[in-house]
Design a protein with these regions (language model features):
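Rossmann-fold NAD(P) dinucleotide-binding segment
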Residues: 64-68, 80-99
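Short, conserved SAM-binding/catalytic segment
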Residues: 41-49, 113-114
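Conserved Rossmann-fold cofactor-binding substructure of NAD(P)-dependent oxidoreductases
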Residues: 53-69, 74-81
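Active-site-lining helix/loop region of Rossmann-like oxidoreductase modules
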Residues: 8, 142-287, 291-295, 305
Length: 353
């Protein structure tokens, strides 16, 4: 391999899953974080891996983790609060970068600000948010070609308790999904002051999603310039989605999360064992008159297991050598068929709607 793979946030829930996935794929990553005892315990469990101290509150410690051609994987969130240290470190070092961010405004920063000055490849939102939506959208567009003018992507969970299924870190980051300033794509990425809501039919049910910003708004039009409109929806909040749509963005976040039950974040931090969540992703392509051209449905298991598997795979591919630079989506970085196979390996694959 050309460079080392470093996991920043290795002792967090997603970080530890990612470390185990990499070891399972034959890689010995460097484990980085601020809790020396937890790092030592995880390193010993995984066969004596190298560890390194780094704390996002002290950016120079994060910068010391990587040099040119290394691969920095960061799972440290909320990313709007803690993510910039790793992102800036990778860009400054010329190291490749993958994150598991789902926070829209942070994803936008990577594409709008950091991507243009990077001499390495930056792969933001490289987890359950937003790799499957990129895959489903690209598969739909590949099927219908230039006839597509609009694409709608929806992310949905099922199969178990949302509280037991989601980690504390996800609940801390959840307000960033419905942030005060959101964006969409209408012949370019533009601000969206209020949430939009739409229903998706899947597996004999109607599921409601509320609009969010994602990497799809940047990546799908880049590879399909005929697109005029890209929408991404999150189906976590059920009936609260329609309440959120009537409120300004900041209040929408509080309403949707509050509606799901008081103390969710506190309960999630006490999360014992694994939940039983399943994943469902849909992409629907439309022509310029609003006619449905095709739908692609993906289905799989636990989103955290998927994130760990796909991040581990992506980090390995990048470490083996990348000539591309700047902020990219997963299809542009690796190719459509390769990405579909990798997602299936990680636990999410194509199904009949």
């Amino acid at each position: 391999m050309a460079g080392r793979i470093v996991i920043f946030g290795a002792t967090g829930y997603t970080g530890a899953l990612t470390a185990r996935a990499l070891v399972g794929q034959g890689v010995r990553p460097v484990l980085a974080g601020r809790n020396a005892n937890a790092l030592a315990a995880l390193a010993a469990e995984l066969g004596g891996l190298e560890t390194a101290y780094a704390d996002a509150d002290y950016p120079w410690t994060v910068r010391s983790l990587v040099e040119r051609d290394d691969v920095l994987v960061t799972t440290v969130g909320p990313f709007r609060r803690y993510g910039h240290a790793a992102l800036a470190a990778a860009v400054d070092a010329g190291a490749h970068y993958l994150d598991t961010a789902g926070e829209s405004l942070f994803v936008r920063e990577v594409f709008d600000e950091y991507g243009v000055k990077a001499s390495s490849v930056l792969l933001p939102a490289f987890g359950y948010h937003h790799v499957p939506g990129n895959l489903a959208g690209a598969l739909a567009l590949d099927r219908v070609g230039e006839d597509a003018a609009r694409i709608d992507v929806g992310y949905f969970l099922g199969g178990g308790s949302l509280v037991r299924g989601l980690s504390g870190g996800t609940f801390e980051s959840a307000p960033g999904l419905l942030a005060t300033r959101m964006y969409t794509y209408r012949d370019g990425v533009v601000d969206e002051p209020r949430s939009q809501v739409r229903d998706f039919a899947m597996a004999g049910r109607t599921r409601t999603g509320v609009s969010i910003g994602g990497s799809e708004h940047f990546t799908l039009p880049a590879s399909h310039p005929g697109l005029r409109e890209v929408n991404v929806y999150l189906g976590w909040f059920g009936a609260a989605s329609r309440i959120a749509a009537r409120l300004p963005r900041g209040r929408a976040a509080a309403a949707a999360i509050g509606f799901c039950g008081r103390g969710l974040a506190r309960m999630a931090r006490r999360r014992a064992g694994k939940g039983t969540l399943t994943s469902r992703i849909v992409a629907a392509a439309y022509d310029a008159q609003g006619g449905l051209l095709t739908e692609i449905h993906l289905s799989g298991g636990d989103p955290y297991d998927f994130t760990a598997g796909i991040v581990a795979w992506g980090a390995r591919q990048v470490a083996d050598g990348m000539t591309e630079t700047g902020a990219l989506g997963p299809v542009a970085a690796f190719g459509l068929s390769e990405l579909e196979a990798a997602c299936a390996m990680a636990g999410i694959s194509r199904v009949t709607g």
